[in-house]
Amino acid sequence: MPAPIRLRELIRTIRTARTQAEEREMIQKECAAIRSSFREEDNTYRCRNVAKLLYMHMLGYPAHFGQLECLKLIASQKFTDKRIGYLGAMLLLDERQDVHLLMTNCIKNDLNHSTQFVQGLALCTLGCMGSSEMCRDLAGEVEKLLKTSNSYLRKKAALCAVHVIRKVPELMEMFLPATKNLLNEKNHGVLHTSVVLLTEMCERSPDMLAHFRKLVPQLVRILKNLIMSGYSPEHDVSGISDPFLQVRILRLLRILGRNDDDSSEAMNDILAQVATNTETSKNVGNAILYETVLTIMDIKSESGLRVLAINILGRFLLNNDKNIRYVALTSLLKTVQTDHNAVQRHRSTIVDCLKDLDVSIKRRAMELSFALVNGNNIRGMMKELLYFLDSCEPEFKADCASGIFLAAEKYAPSKRWHIDTIMRVLTTAGSYVRDDAVPNLIQLITNSVEMHAYTVQRLYKAILGDYSQQPLVQVAAWCIGEYGDLLVSGQCEEEEPIQVTEDEVLDILESVLISNMSTSVTRGYALTAIMKLSTRFTCTVNRIKKVVSIYGSSIDVELQQRAVEYNALFKKYDHMRSALLERMPVMEKVTTNGPTEIVQTNGETEPAPLETKPPPSGPQPTSQANDLLDLLGGNDITPVIPTAPTSKPSSAGGELLDLLGDINLTGAPAAAPAPASVPQISQPPFLLDGLSSQPLFNDIAAGIPSITAYSKNGLKIEFTFERSNTNPSVTVITIQASNSTELDMTDFVFQAAVPKTFQLQLLSPSSSIVPAFNTGTITQVIKVLNPQKQQLRMRIKLTYNHKGSAMQDLAEVNNFPPQSWQ
């Protein structure tokens, strides 16, 4: 049989192929020759054939038939054969294939070989693809090589030990004695790998972390020697001595100093020295400075040192390299909550990043800009962010508009400024705002009594001939319906009033009704606005009747139903029309400690509940009717029942005008005292369960299995169930939240929503902190009334802070045991 071609010739031949098909033909031909050689047990050219097979594997062609040949090469006594065999094993084998277990004995023999290079090959292979079984069998040999005096083997053994610990964490203590002397080594390779090993052990075990904290002075001394040493050609990179080792030591110091005052104090001086002495003209220096900043911000460092770190990030923002600017913005975003004033000094530079061409930098700059907004700079920051909203790409508009809404609501210097800002957003990016923007703005306008004339005039001007921004048109239609009389009378004092007739107002609302751009919801707003104007205008009532009657035969069912109801109001209940269509009362939002909305899985938003304060005296029949006619839309999610009954005024004629069905919102519990003079609507019996001192639960709870409702990112939520004695329709769910990560989860908030056929009562949690390492749990009780015995479903939302970041997640719970609801 002729000698096979060499690897170099194969590469040259393959590169001459002009098409993919021609290349495949060459590969298949060579693979056939290699298979034939393997079948004939040709030991002479086995090494050459496996090398060619590895090249084909790198090109993406199948090479699995060479796995056993790699094992044969590993068993060979020739170093060249072993080298190719081990390389082939690392490329073609992994722990999912049983073939790799056949290597265990060969690797063990080679770990005890007299030649260091053979031992090095075995260590590399074990550290690359060793399974847990192999690691368990060979850990003793690795630990022995970790204690050898040979630096070449010690650095490889340290990295192999890292892999062993990752695969078999319980073997960690085996390597503890050997690691103590690793930091005394002068060889930088050994130092580097030993720091990697120490880092892995500290991250995986709190006991190891506490044990190695006493090494902080030694690590500080090594780092100081690196930055103070002179030129060393062996380790120098762009004028900096071994930056890779410096970065590794800084990362280990960050882990050791976290939540420990003594360790942090010991490393403060060296961190300041690194931050001030490192050259920033080259990227190598910037990498070290970045790690230094992360370490300073993560440990309990001095305030002056933290300011120095933030100033370094501020200098990064001026760098021409986009990657450096991006990491600076990301780091500032993480630290802005703890060092707000120091970050504020770089506000102008951050705002300039909004004009960057890179979309990633632009997004980070936008997020950081919103984090910097406060009551002192709200006007200037909003000016910049509104300019950004005008010119940014469509993918930014939704987040930017949402951020402006939240900032304006929190820091608005005046109601007029607040209204103007939101109207500017709706005019610029109305089609990108969240669903709750419209009711929130309406609530703001309603509460600003002195701004009604100004607002309705501004909105009227804003939608003249332009209906493209539907949320803006909806708010304008609502305001014109409520305050159209102020628009016509020209009572605006804040700016020059305009002359508008009743017919002109109706013209624009009718234009909204017939516009192709108007959605069904917008048409509903417009039709209701026209109906409300029948009590505010005097000369156009007949025209309003005609418009309403026309839409009584609309193909839009929602619009048709409204028109029919309004026609009935004209014909049968005209004497009640003025009272039913009077102005909306002041609306107040509920204030909760948790988030104010639940973002649904389809991306829509469920607004937070509105709490209506009880009237000062006596029933008020018109208020309920007005609420029913406040056609802002309903929801099919049931409310969270308060722990104390709330008052609800009786309504005369409200049932006739229930145009929406139940208006149900979900949110956190909120109690409102009820005046004695207001008649009460009876609440479900389970509302008083929490106030009773009698045993409320029967023995069937013992047969209800608990479930895991959520398990992700170390957070686990478990549900246990009990059934009420007094009312079998009530299921009491106790949630237990546990945290398996190494850091506490703070500001924990659990929210839940159930379908409309259920009623839900969410009691207060036992705490807002979920302790780390499963050392404690948060408990919270949910009571669910299920009178129809339907299958229980629940949507939950979890929000908490972890590792300095705000976390939020949604989940659907559909695996409730039948015993909990049948």
Swiss-Prot record:
Domain GAE, first and last residues per copy: 702-817
Domain of life: Eukaryota
Subcellular location: Golgi apparatus; Cytoplasmic vesicle, Clathrin-coated vesicle membrane; Cytoplasm; Cytoplasm, Perinuclear region
Expression sites by tissue: Widely expressed.
Substitution effect: residue 35 to W: In USRISD; does not rescue morphological defects in a zebrafish animal model
GO molecular function, one term: small GTPase binding
Keywords: Coated pit, Cytoplasm, Cytoplasmic vesicle, Disease variant, Golgi apparatus, Intellectual disability, Membrane, Protein transport, Transport
PROSITE patterns listed in its UniProt record: GAE
Entries under InterPro entries matching the protein: Adaptor_Complx_Large_Subunit (IPR050840), AP1_complex_gsu (IPR017107), ARM-like (IPR011989), ARM-type_fold (IPR016024), Clathrin/coatomer_adapt-like_N (IPR002553), Clathrin_a/b/g-adaptin_app_Ig (IPR008152), Clathrin_app_Ig-like_sf (IPR013041), GAE_dom (IPR008153)
Signal peptide: none
Pfam families, sorted: Adaptin_N, Alpha_adaptinC2
GO cellular component: AP-1 adaptor complex; clathrin-coated pit; clathrin-coated vesicle; clathrin-coated vesicle membrane; cytoplasm; cytoplasmic vesicle membrane; cytosol; early endosome
Biological process terms in GO annotation: basolateral protein secretion; endosome to melanosome transport; Golgi to lysosome transport; Golgi to vacuole transport; intracellular protein transport; melanosome assembly; melanosome organization; platelet dense granule organization
Major place of residence: Golgi
Effect of residue 817 to R: In USRISD; does not fully rescue morphological defects in a zebrafish animal model
Membrane topology, from the record: Peripheral membrane protein
Region annotation Disordered: where it falls in the sequence: 597-628
Oligomer status and interactors: Adaptor protein complex 1 (AP-1) is a heterotetramer composed of two large adaptins (gamma-type subunit AP1G1 and beta-type subunit AP1B1), a medium adaptin (mu-type subunit AP1M1 or AP1M2) and a small adaptin (sigma-type subunit AP1S1 or AP1S2 or AP1S3). Interacts (via GAE domain) with RABEP1. Interacts with SYNRG/gamma-synergin. Interacts with EPS15. Interacts (via GAE domain) with AP1AR (via coiled-coil domain). Interacts with CLN3 (via dileucine motif); this interaction facilitates lysosomal targeting.
Function: Subunit of clathrin-associated adaptor protein complex 1 that plays a role in protein sorting in the late-Golgi/trans-Golgi network (TGN) and/or endosomes. The AP complexes mediate both the recruitment of clathrin to membranes and the recognition of sorting signals within the cytosolic tails of transmembrane cargo molecules.
Linked pathology: Usmani-Riazuddin syndrome, autosomal dominant: A neurodevelopmental disorder characterized by global developmental delay with impaired intellectual development and speech delay, hypotonia, and behavioral abnormalities. More variable additional features may include seizures and distal limb anomalies.
Family recorded in the similarity comment: Belongs to the adaptor complexes large subunit family.
Protein name: AP-1 complex subunit gamma-1
The gene coding this protein: AP1G1
